[in-house]
Amino acid sequence: MAVFLLDKPLFLHILTQLRDIKTDQIMFRKGMVRLGRLIGYEIANHLDFDIVKVVTPLGVEAKGVVIKDLDNIMIVNVLRAATPLVEGLLKAFPAAKQGVVAASRREMESSSPPTEMEVEITYMKIPKISKNDIAIIADPMIATASTMMRILGMVSQLQPKRIIIASVIASEYGITKIRNKYPDVDIFTVSIDPEINNRGYIVPGLGDAGDRSFG
């Protein structure tokens, strides 16, 4: 398992806007879309490719690159929070198939940060994939990773060639939890935040990504 921390200035500039309580719903959603596109480009940079030769309009041969798996991508949208993130990912992978999972966690305040949250999955529709496909699971926030672990269990049964998680913020605990059970899964995230509060939210985080995107 590899964790790709996307802490370049442009990523962090957008993330700063998303963290800011003063950022309104429209700008928050636009920021999520922008990050989705940028994360998609970073994922594409880590896909297999071939070196090829093409002939330019000047009749000259030029060396080029063809990324192998751009037509073998399936993106899983964890509703509803991931929808703007997926919109951006689809700009990077316009030929991608898309699956959806409607998942919600039961939130309650406890005396200490929870290590597990009760997750209800009310709907799932994932297209048929082959062993040549790459599954990208999009979820902007990975706190206790309870939702992600449920979805990883379902997607891994489909036996794609590779599973990638696209997130904006992940907790240290959530990454460790995923790594222990799914060591072959790669995670792309903009920030790794240190804490989870008593309600299961990442701290400092950015609040509830679904509520901030859609109200």
From Swiss-Prot:
Tell me its cofactors.
Answer: Mg(2+)
Q: Which domain of life is it from?
A: Archaea
Give the enzyme's EC designation.
Answer: 2.4.2.9
Q: How is its activity regulated?
A: Allosterically activated by GTP.
| Catalytic activity, reaction form | UMP + diphosphate = 5-phospho-alpha-D-ribose 1-diphosphate + uracil
Q: Does the keyword Glycoprotein apply?
A: no
Q: Name one GO molecular function term.
A: uracil phosphoribosyltransferase activity
Q: Pathway, per UniProt? A: Pyrimidine metabolism; UMP biosynthesis via salvage pathway; UMP from uracil: step 1/1
Cofactor stoichiometry and binding? Binds 1 Mg(2+) ion per subunit. The magnesium is bound as Mg-PRPP.
Name the Pfam families for this protein. UPRTase
Keywords recorded for this protein, A-Z? Allosteric enzyme, Glycosyltransferase, GTP-binding, Magnesium, Nucleotide-binding, Transferase
One GO BP annotation here?
UMP salvage
Which residues are noted in the entry as uracil-binding? 202, 207-209
Chain positions recorded as GTP binding sites: 30-34
Amino-acid positions noted as binding 5-phospho-alpha-D-ribose 1-diphosphate in the UniProt annotation, renumbered to this chain = 80, 105, 139-147, 208
Homology family: Belongs to the UPRTase family.
Q: What does this protein do?
A: Catalyzes the conversion of uracil and 5-phospho-alpha-D-ribose 1-diphosphate (PRPP) to UMP and diphosphate.
Report the protein name in the record: Uracil phosphoribosyltransferase
Origin species: Metallosphaera sedula (strain ATCC 51363 / DSM 5348 / JCM 9185 / NBRC 15509 / TH2)
High-level lineage? Archaea, Thermoproteota, Thermoprotei, Sulfolobales, Sulfolobaceae
The gene designation is upp
